[in-house]
């Protein structure tokens, strides 16, 4: 029991530091993500009932299935073959360089090189859905 005496203080500190965001930090990140996402609206919509354009509507994309979420949208075979769901790690890879993640994708966007901007967009996308 004595050896575990350090565990409680360690657990208390686990939520401290730069990685521990406050609600305000999260709100700021979502707002930044919304601003960065404006570039995406050249091809994507994000409204609950909005249709697809050159790209699929991204409402509810986070947590949704990859390459099959919008039945009327023509996803590439490469994207369909990925399988699984969009989580933060996969979305980060996709936003960094879609063509590297899925060779043959028809998404013309080259990617978002800045990791913070990608994280901001992912935070925004996570708020846009059920």
PLM feature segments, named:
Residues 20-23, 47, 128-130:
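Inter-heme linker and motif-flanking segments adjacent to c-type heme-binding CXXCH motifs
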Residues 33, 37-46, 121-125:
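The canonical Cys-X-X-Cys-His
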Residues 85-130:
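C-terminal capping alpha-helices of c-type cytochrome domains
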């Amino acid at each position: 029991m004595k050896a575990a005496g350090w565990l409680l203080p360690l657990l208390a500190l686990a939520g401290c530091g730069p990685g521990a965001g406050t609600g305000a930090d999260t709100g700021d990140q979502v707002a930044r993500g919304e601003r960065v996402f404006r570039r995406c609206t050249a091809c994507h919509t994000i409204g609950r009932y909005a249709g697809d354009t050159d790209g699929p509507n991204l409402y509810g994309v986070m947590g949704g299935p990859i390459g099959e979420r919008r039945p009327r949208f023509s996803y590439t075979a490469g994207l369909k073959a990925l399988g699984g769901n969009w989580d933060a790690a996969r979305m980060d890879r996709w936003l960094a360089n879609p063509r590297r993640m899925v060779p043959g994708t028809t998404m013309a966007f080259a990617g978002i090189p800045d990791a913070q901007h990608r994280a901001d967009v992912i935070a925004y996308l996570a708020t846009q859905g059920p």
